[in-house]
């Protein structure tokens, strides 16, 4: 983020859930370890956040030709709610189509073995509702992300996150720079 804010590119940094005021409220509900939410309600809360986010932040900035960096988006929903919550991936994709959600030009998939990822999450902060799920939940999500990447390798790029932070940053930055150069 700091790197791109120093450059003379028009960039937006955002996240889901939580990239709008409504999204912040939804994020609080979704991540609260005390929340008990059905899989279907979880999906619809995420989609409510997403449509608000796309309508008020993503689409207006795309129209201004800004570069948008979004921490989580449609692939996360397919992985978490599709494989993680055992909801129909086809129905999720149909919902994405119905809502006319833009497909990212590039998705960066930072991959780590599940156990290593959970160790990092534990060190970072108190675990949220998703992070507290059992190991099989996380393994199914990782598997889903890897399957998505194999199906769409021109859009979803896989990076081994077990390498040094500096090397990972360099590798990801090189790819992003290449993509920006190709599109401008």
Kindly give the residue locations of the regions a language model identified.
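NTP-dependent small-molecule kinase module
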Residues: 1-3, 115-184
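ATP-dependent small-molecule kinase phosphotransfer cores
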Residues: 9-98
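Active-site donor-binding loop signature of nucleotide-sugar glycosyltransferases
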Residues: 16, 48, 112, 132, ...
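A glycine- and Lys/Arg-enriched "phosphate-lid" helix/loop adjacent to the NTP-binding pocket
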Residues: 72-143
């Amino acid at each position: 983020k700091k790197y791109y804010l120093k450059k003379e590119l028009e960039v937006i940094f955002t996240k889901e859930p939580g990239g709008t005021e409504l999204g912040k409220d939804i994020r609080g509900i979704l991540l609260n370890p005390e929340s008990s939410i059905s899989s279907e309600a979880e999906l619809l809360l995420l989609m409510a956040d997403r449509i608000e986010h796309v309508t008020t932040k993503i689409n207006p900035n795309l129209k201004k030709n800004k570069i948008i960096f979004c921490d989580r988006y449609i692939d996360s929903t397919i992985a978490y709610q599709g494989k993680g919550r055992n909801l129909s991936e086809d129905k999720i994709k149909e919902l994405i189509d119905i809502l006319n959600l833009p497909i990212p030009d590039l998705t960066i998939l930072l991959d780590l073995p599940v156990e290593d990822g959970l160790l990092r999450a534990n060190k970072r902060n108190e675990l949220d509702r998703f992070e507290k799920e059992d190991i099989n939940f996380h393994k199914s999500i990782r598997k889903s992300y890897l399957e998505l990447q194999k199906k769409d390798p021109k859009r979803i790029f896989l990076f081994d996150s077990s390498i040094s932070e500096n090397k990972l940053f360099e590798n990801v930055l090189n790819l992003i720079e290449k993509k920006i150069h190709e599109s401008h």
